[in-house]
Design a protein with these regions (language model features):
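A binding-site-centric feature that preferentially detects glycan-recognition modules on secreted/surface proteins
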Residues: 2-130, 134-198
Length: 198
């Protein structure tokens, strides 16, 4: 699932089928994440032509280790007004293919040594997904225990970012914690989780 269709945000038919099989299987194994929702309703939103770029973004989430799945907690589930389904990165730990990145491009440019290849904000934008907010991260953690060994960057309020900081979260001691770092920092056990509205 690594190669896209002529570098466009489209998948080849065989890539699409492999991805949909993986998504359907994960959906069926984790019904606690989306009680009352049927896979057929989700797949209908992913069918061409509307699902083209969305499938590409889901494939990027999958390719980088996010294990995307539809999540329907009370506060952040299907949008009743728009009828959207929302896919979240549901890997047990922060996605392996997105680790060792700083927070954003400004932070990347400030690094004098150990230049990094990417940053969380730009990487998410290139994938067509959104970083989780603190509220969204906490709601996700109500479903299962995520990030017990890793941590994930989250959207940082402008006032904190203006002063050079950035926020990240994890779960330790059966509690969800929010921390701060310099935005230019990076760690092998820190990545980011995203969401995709379909």
């Amino acid at each position: 699932m690594n190669n896209t269709n002529s570098n466009k945000k489209k998948l080849w038919p065989e890539q699409r089928e492999v991805l949909l099989r993986a998504l359907k299987a994960r959906f069926g194994k984790n019904m606690n994440r989306h009680k009352g929702l049927e896979w057929a309703k989700v797949q209908a939103k992913l069918d061409p032509p509307a699902g083209g770029e969305k499938l590409w973004s889901l494939n990027e989430m999958e390719r980088t280790g996010g294990e995307p799945d539809v999540v329907v907690p009370i506060a952040i589930g299907n949008d009743k007004k728009t009828g959207e389904c929302i896919f979240y990165d549901c890997s047990a730990e922060s996605p392996k293919g997105r680790r060792s990145v700083c927070y954003d491009h400004e932070a990347l440019e400030l690094r004098k040594e150990h230049k990094l290849d990417n940053n969380a904000i730009d990487m998410a934008a290139a994938m067509g997904i959104e970083l989780l907010s603190e509220e969204q991260y906490r709601e996700l953690q109500k479903l299962e225990n995520f990030d017990t060994k890793t941590s994930s960057w989250i959207i940082t309020p402008p006032g904190i970012r203006k002063l050079g900081g950035a926020l990240f979260c994890d779960r330790r001691y059966n509690h969800v914690f929010v921390y701060h770092n310099g935005a230019e920092s990076y760690y092998a056990a820190k990545a980011f989780r995203g969401l995709l509205r379909v």
